[in-house]
């Protein structure tokens, strides 16, 4: 019998959620996603030392200012890891903008353009890159600008329907609604486990997927942040799913039928008028889980970015 991973691939584009090139090569995903936490983790892998050294060398050639060198090294390290990953995936790499720019549209656009230039200078074309931005109002506006410049974006840390709707209305290429982190919040609040079919994260992504397909939005839905393979299998049929190596391993070892749960209806329902800033903030604010998890996610990515910078500063 074929494995669940093999069956899932027939229904959904499988993406690897890791910066570990060895793990990516093992599971042959279409794309890969990274974030500040995963870049920090990757930077601690011994085999990646030459990438860090090359990034430091680049930064020193750009500036004599230590703080600027740290910034440039971190950016180039993310790009260098991305370049290595692109040698083993046929599709795209997602590289994230500094989380500390999550409420700064202009700063996010500038950083995204800089990352794209670094990739382009290395011979990597835009159609192989997704720029990751937090799904704040400012991040969504940055994505709207970048998409018009031919820079496709992956809007991450997405927890509320308001965020999903605003992303679709801005014409962003792809969203990453978080499944496991939503479930974490409800599990802590209600003190119980959830069956995969009633998992609040699964329910959230299913609702977003159906809304997009019913209204004919082209934005790709890529479920992310999974805690178990039950959540993944409940979203079989989703456009894409980004999965950590340990869960890819579980899927590869599991057999049994994988049933398509999400189906594209190719709908053409009338779309509502685009949300205003005030409407977005109000609707998002009605979801306590989303407010808490978005803020926490940004803080945690910023902490890991700081750790990476400290690690780099010690090497300069």
UniProtKB/Swiss-Prot annotation:
Keywords: Cytoplasm, Pentose shunt, Schiff base, Transferase. The active site is at 132 (schiff-base intermediate with substrate). InterPro entries: Aldolase_TIM, TAL/FSA, Transaldolase_1, Transaldolase_AS. It comes from the Bacteria. It is an enzyme of class 2 (transferase). GO terms for molecular function: transaldolase activity. It catalyses: D-sedoheptulose 7-phosphate + D-glyceraldehyde 3-phosphate = D-erythrose 4-phosphate + beta-D-fructose 6-phosphate. Coiled coil: none annotated. Pathway: Carbohydrate degradation; pentose phosphate pathway; D-glyceraldehyde 3-phosphate and beta-D-fructose 6-phosphate from D-ribose 5-phosphate and D-xylulose 5-phosphate (non-oxidative stage): step 2/3. GO terms for biological process: carbohydrate metabolic process; pentose-phosphate shunt. It is found in: Cytoplasm. Its EC number is 2.2.1.2. One of its GO terms (cellular component) is cytosol. SUPFAM superfamilies: Aldolase (SSF51569). Belongs to the transaldolase family. Type 1 subfamily. Homodimer. Transaldolase is important for the balance of metabolites in the pentose-phosphate pathway. This is Transaldolase. The gene is tal.
């Amino acid at each position: 019998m074929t494995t669940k991973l093999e069956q899932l691939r027939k229904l959904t584009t499988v993406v690897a959620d890791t910066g570990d090139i060895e793990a990516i090569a093992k599971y042959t995903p279409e794309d890969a996603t990274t974030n500040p936490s995963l870049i920090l983790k990757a930077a601690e892998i011994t085999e990646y030392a030459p990438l860090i050294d090359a990034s430091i060398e680049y930064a020193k050639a750009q500036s004599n200012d230590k703080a600027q060198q740290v910034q440039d090294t971190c950016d180039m390290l993310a790009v260098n890891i991305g370049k290595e990953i692109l040698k083993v995936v046929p599709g795209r790499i997602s590289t994230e903008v500094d989380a500390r720019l999550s409420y700064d549209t202009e700063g996010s656009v500038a950083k995204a353009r800089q990352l794209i230039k670094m990739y382009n200078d290395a011979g990597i074309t835009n159609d192989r890159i997704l720029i990751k931005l937090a799904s704040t109002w400012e991040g969504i506006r940055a994505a709207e600008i970048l998409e018009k410049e031919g820079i496709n974006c992956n809007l991450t840390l997405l927890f509320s329907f308001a965020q999903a709707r605003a992303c679709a209305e801005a014409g962003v290429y792809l969203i990453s609604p978080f499944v496991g982190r939503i479930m974490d919040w409800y599990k802590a609040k209600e003190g119980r486990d959830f069956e995969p079919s009633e998992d609040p994260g699964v329910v959230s992504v299913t609702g977003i997927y159906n809304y997009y397909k019913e209204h004919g939005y082209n934005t790709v839905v890529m479920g992310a942040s999974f805690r178990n393979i039950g959540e993944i299998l409940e979203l079989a049929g989703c456009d894409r799913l980004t999965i950590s190596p340990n869960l890819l391993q579980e899927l590869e070892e599991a057999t049994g039928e994988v049933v398509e749960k999400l189906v594209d209806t190719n709908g053409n329902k009338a779309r509502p008028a685009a949300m205003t800033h005030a409407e977005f903030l109000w609707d998002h604010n009605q979801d306590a889980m989303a407010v808490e998890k978005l803020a926490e996610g940004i803080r945690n990515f910023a902490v890991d970015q700081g750790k990476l910078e400290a690690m780099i500063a010690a090497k300069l």
